[in-house]
Structure formats: C-alpha cells, structure tokens
Swiss-Prot record:
Biological function: Gut bactericidal protein that selectively kills Gram-positive bacteria by binding to negatively charged lipids on bacterial membranes, leading to bacterial membrane permeabilization and disruption. Specifically binds lipids bearing negatively charged headgroups, such as phosphatidic acid, phosphatidylserine (PS), cardiolipin (CL), and phosphatidylinositol phosphates, but not to zwitterionic or neutral lipids. Induced by type-2 cytokines in response to helminth infection and is required to protect against helminth-induced bacterial invasion of intestinal tissue.
Transport as UniProt keyword: no
Gene Ontology biological-process entries: antibacterial humoral response; defense response to Gram-positive bacterium; host-mediated regulation of intestinal microbiota composition; regulation of cell shape; response to estradiol
Post-translational modification: Forms five pairs of intrachain disulfide bonds.
Protein name: Small proline-rich protein 2A1
GO molecular function, one term: lipid binding
Keywords associated with the record: Antibiotic, Antimicrobial, Cytoplasmic vesicle, Disulfide bond, Lipid-binding, Repeat, Secreted
Gene: Sprr2a1
Length: 83
C-alpha cells in the first residue's frame, strides 16, 4: 500500500509538482492549542512527535487550491503500488 493510500485511504493522487508554499496557517512545532483541528498543510507537521491524538495528515486533494497549482506543469508519476 502506498503512502498516500495508507494515509488517506483514498485513490492515489500525484503530489504537487512545484514546491508548495508555507502552510496556509502556521503549523505549531510541538504544542497544538485548543481542540484537535485539521492542519491544511501539504506535508504533515512532525507526525512522529505530534502530541495527543491529533492527526494533521491531510490528503493532497483535500487541501485548499493554491495559485501555483494552475501554473505548474504536470509530471508523470509511477502508478500506485497495490498490495
């Protein structure tokens, strides 16, 4: 099972071609104040040391559209590994 299938439990989607900008909202390095809420980051924020049950991992297709997505050329990615 690929990383994206395992994390999202959805059909695989290719990652963004261009380097994504900073997170739409700041990603706390260690402490996430208040109740758990999704972090709309294209890369998870320190999932291995994330405190508590919060899971900031978000599928790429669930992230809000970014301006660079319309200008980046598409790139072919290998098909997802099925197990």
């Amino acid at each position: 099972m690929s990383y994206y299938q395992q994390q999202c439990n959805q059909p695989c989607r290719p990652p963004p071609v261009c380097p994504p900008p900073k997170c739409p909202e700041p990603c706390p390095p260690q402490v996430w104040p208040g109740p758990c809420r999704p972090v709309m980051c294209f890369e998870p924020c320190l999932p291995s040391v994330w405190p508590g049950p919060c899971r900031p991992v978000v599928c790429y297709e669930q992230c809000p559209p970014q301006p660079w997505q319309s200008t980046c050329p598409p790139v072919q990615f290998p098909p997802c590994q099925q197990k």
